[in-house]
Amino acid sequence: MSETINTAAQFPSFEKPTVQFNERGWGPCELPDTFKDVPYQPFSKNDRLGKICDWTSTSNNDKKYQNKYASSFGTGNQYSYYHEEDETTFHLVDTARVQKPPHQRGRFRNMRGRGGRGRNPRGGLNNHHHHGMTTLNGKNVKARDTRRGMGKKFGHRGPPPKMRESSVAVRADWASIEEMDFPRLIKLSLPNIKDGVDIATCGTLEYYDKTYDRINVKNEKPLQKIDRIVHTVTTTDDPVIRRLSKTVGNVFATDAILATIMCSTRSNYSWDIVIEKVGDKIFMDKRDHTEFDLLTVNESSVEPPTDDDSSCNSPRNLAIEATFINHNFSQQVLKTGDQEAKFKFEEPNPFISEDEDIQVASVGYRYKKWELGSDIVLVARCEHDGVLQTPSGEPQFMSIKALNEWDSKLANGVEWRQKLDTQRGAVLANELRNNACKLAKWTVQAVLAGSDQLKLGYVSRINPRDHSRHVILGTQQFKPHEFATQINLSMDNAWGVLRCIIDLVMKQKDGKYLIMKDPNKPIIRLYDIPDNTFDSDDSDDGEGDDGEGFQQVYNYANNSNKI
């Protein structure tokens, strides 16, 4: 059987290509379809594809014309190498040159010849003459400090901020009614609110000891631990407010609660206030066994304390320390003793009975009312800490508070022992920057109470690592209204914020509500909560409704109301 062999299939065929004839020049007349829309960039085969770093080349002495011998190819980014790995953990470093102030420009312009050979104009050794040693001139030192984190103020992306915890856990059965952001609250204003009118006055005050005005850094005085009872009673537990609510007012609160609401736009930490609406009356209360009465420390600082709870410099331990200092200082600067004169109000202290034999702190209570318009009458309990005898014989009531220094290095503050006597304004300005909310609250409380003076004490630790021993370094006094102007505190805005919240609650039905500052956002939220929320019967052994009880850290403060 014969097979036919195809000889044409054994040899490759040759097809004549199409040759374009260019009459006006050389090269193809048309671009092939395979090369259309392909970007082209001049390149050289000697160029590296993405050179990362070169540690072998010597520094170029001719810095003015250092690029005159460089290749002109490869200047684009078509052949650059890009690493596709996630780089979100890297921190950006600002390499922009900081402009010098006018008094530093041209300082070393005419000193180039003084350094000599092998030296820079400032006298330092140049690196290109000494390859075996590493020298740091002024620019390198600045760059090194920038890499170490000195340039955070230029917008570097540092580590993520620590998330703060909420003062109370929001439950699923709570209904959110309103969110009020700080930019909107700052614009509120309620002007022409007259001073409050006294309804009742209770308690006994001791006179201020003027010898504490002569204390300075060189003549410091130890802070004593005074065993006295301080009552921090909420609104609905006050027997005087219960009596007055039957005849006077329709909004009831304490000065601490009002100050928290009025200064809410300066707060960073979370806080909450319980509001009960019964008919046309509103009662503002604080929750039991909470940290509402603790004083914050460096709340408005650029770098607030973030240590863990085991450290004495944690936010909570610093708050307990500041509260302990404030209570003891306000009682130590008074003239105590049975032989000393005392100022007594019309009624005795409403929180102690006649058969109780306890030593109570010097506190005077003023129950005042304010007309806020639209038939809203506010009744609040305000406090005085002491009284001062004037040469004319008229008493001046005082609000006595204490600022505390814990560790100036960790707090990015100024050394009180170095600046307090000579630059007290700088110390106060630093405190206004770090504790803006706390100072604003004290000022509002003094204005509401009608205090004639706001006395501030400067108390510091004996040792920065010892949070149990303190000394008094000095005192300073202000008039509350003048101090409010000095710290840019607008009482019209404070009354406007309070009136906004009152109007919002007045529109709701009868029940229990809660306003809370968001722990990480400048927002205040209003919640509608069940009537049995935060009832004392639901908690045992002093634990709050959120399951976490208030526990004291200091051994000398086993009682939350005892100092």
From Swiss-Prot:
InterPro entries, per this entry? eIF3d
Plastid among keywords: no
Where are the residues of the annotated region RNA gate?
Answer: 291-305
Q: Could you tell me where the Basic residues compositional bias lies? A: 100-120
Q: Which residues cross the membrane?
A: none
Q: Which GO terms describe its molecular function?
A: mRNA cap binding; translation initiation factor activity
Does the record bear RNA-binding in its keywords? yes
Protein name stated in the entry: Eukaryotic translation initiation factor 3 subunit D-1
Q: Show the GO cellular component annotation of the record.
A: eukaryotic 43S preinitiation complex; eukaryotic 48S preinitiation complex; eukaryotic translation initiation factor 3 complex
